[in-house]
């Protein structure tokens, strides 16, 4: 369980308009947990957004792939984020450089209060590939998918790419939020 509270506690970032509770790999992680150029990696995990889950209209990230090193390391390469809207939605965001675009999105309601299994496959490199599939665990039905066989998945000066999971959300519209407990399970990182 990843707990997040709307009232101030110790889950603030350097910027006080946002908060995070995440796990991630980092430079001291074993090499097989770090994405490197010309490598294909499969990330798998399960997660559940609880009944009544409330997203920020700004961002509520639940997963990111982020470069370490180089001038673009502050901008995530891929982001799964939920967003308050009409209707609320799940978005897959991508940034080749320092500008993010939405690659795909779906209504959030069918993803609430169900266990989901995610399979994300990425080939890191300037001639990269990316595929993500989110299925409902109870019946294996596909809730979200996206695939691209010609996408840039490496940044100049990057040392490696690290995955992140948890809750990272904006507090700019805190009135739209509540205390949350996001559930994750069965993390897997496999090099092919």
What do these predicted ranges mean?
Residues 1-116, 122-192:
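Low-complexity, Ser/Thr/Pro/Gly-rich disordered linker/stalk regions
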